[in-house]
């Protein structure tokens, strides 16, 4: 409001006259002389009184009333016109903005109503950053025992393992964690928390693409006393629990080194007499290999005796591969 008043005053100045002192043309006569002359009084007290009255009369005559100039009608009309233009422009701008937003909202609603529904496609689901649940379940769980395993701690929560804690073992790298901790970790990661080994590549390949090996014929023969060939390899397998899953042979390198020592000393594995049965494995390329040198000929002989169990295992022999996959013997 003060800014508007200042603007109006600066645009339309108002002429205001202030009171001014008007000079007197008539000469100033000494009051005492005039008074004494006119009244013929020589008393000092009377002269002083007459001087005061003369001064007051002179001051009254010197001042005139103040006259101010009132604003003209033209100034009032111009001020009112300016205010009307300002308020009209402001309200017009505000009204046009509201009207434009209303029209845009109506147009968008009309366009969305006429749009075909088949054009609306759902967004792609986010990619799963965690490990597959099948791979997680493939890692074994076991209750922890301080007496058997000693003192150890979980690398995720940094707390020591206590008795009867459920532990999950990552068989790929042999690292153990609390089941709850490692399951939460696998929801957003695919690696081991300790060694950062990628667990998704190898495990997914083994789950989705099982090992394909050709089947071989197992020939069961009755007990016989004829000597075995020098290059025959005999593997002892128990048959005490036929329905039990065949176990795993670890330390493949030790088996191969032991085999080489046996061949160097011209020793052989003799058949087991616990059950009196033996299995001779014959391959399709046996006839071709018989024509080769004797050192390259290998015959695999599997005898069922009744002592050990094997799980999934892969043992490499010279020029041959023996696969023991859950009870199915295969040679590649």
Swiss-Prot record:
InterPro entries: RING-H2_zinc_finger, Znf_RING, Znf_RING/FYVE/PHD. Pathway: Protein modification; protein ubiquitination. It is found in: Membrane. A zinc finger (RING-type) spans 154-196. It catalyses: S-ubiquitinyl-[E2 ubiquitin-conjugating enzyme]-L-cysteine + [acceptor protein]-L-lysine = [E2 ubiquitin-conjugating enzyme]-L-cysteine + N(6)-ubiquitinyl-[acceptor protein]-L-lysine. Its EC number is 2.3.2.27. It comes from the Eukaryota. This is RING-H2 finger protein ATL81. The RING-type zinc finger domain mediates binding to an E2 ubiquitin-conjugating enzyme. GO terms for cellular component: membrane. PANTHER family: RING FINGER DOMAIN-CONTAINING, RING-H2 FINGER PROTEIN ATL81. It is a single-pass membrane protein. The gene is ATL81. Residues 1-19 form the signal peptide. The chain crosses the membrane at residues 76-96. Belongs to the RING-type zinc finger family. ATL subfamily. Pfam families: zf-RING_2 (PF13639).
């Amino acid at each position: 409001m003060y800014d508007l008043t200042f603007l109006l005053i600066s645009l339309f100045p108002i002429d205001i006259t202030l009171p001014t002192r008007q000079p007197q043309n008539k000469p100033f006569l000494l009051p005492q002389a005039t008074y004494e002359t006119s009244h013929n009084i020589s008393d000092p007290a009377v002269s002083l009184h007459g001087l005061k009255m003369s001064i007051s009369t002179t001051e009254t005559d010197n001042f005139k009333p103040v006259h101010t100039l009132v604003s003209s009608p033209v100034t009032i009309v111009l001020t009112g016109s300016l205010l009307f233009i300002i308020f009209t422009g402001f309200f017009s701008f505000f009204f046009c903005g509201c009207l434009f937003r209303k029209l845009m909202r109506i147009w968008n609603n009309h366009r969305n109503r006429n749009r075909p529904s088949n054009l609306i496609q759902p967004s792609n689901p986010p990619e799963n950053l965690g490990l597959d649940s099948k791979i997680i379940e493939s890692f074994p769980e076991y209750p922890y025992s301080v007496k058997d395993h000693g003192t150890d701690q979980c690398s995720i929560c940094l707390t020591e393992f206590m008795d009867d804690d459920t532990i999950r073992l990552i068989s790929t790298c042999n690292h153990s964690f609390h089941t709850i901790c490692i399951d939460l970790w696998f929801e957003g990661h695919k690696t081991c928390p300790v060694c950062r080994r990628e667990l998704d590549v190898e495990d997914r390949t083994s789950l989705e693409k099982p090992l394909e090996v050709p089947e071989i014929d197992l020939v069961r023969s009755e007990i016989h006393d004829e000597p075995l060939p020098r290059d025959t390899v005999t593997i002892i397998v128990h048959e005490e629990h036929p329905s039990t899953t065949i176990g795993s042979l670890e330390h493949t390198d030790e088996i191969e080194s032991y085999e080489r020592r046996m061949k160097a000393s011209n020793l052989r594995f003799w058949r087991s007499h616990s059950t009196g049965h033996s299995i001779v494995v014959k391959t399709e390329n046996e006839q071709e290999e018989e024509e080769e040198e004797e050192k390259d000929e290998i015959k695999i002989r599997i005898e069922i005796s009744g002592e050990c169990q094997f799980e999934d295992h892969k043992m490499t022999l010279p020029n041959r591969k023996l696969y023991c996959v859950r009870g199915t013997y295969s040679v590649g």
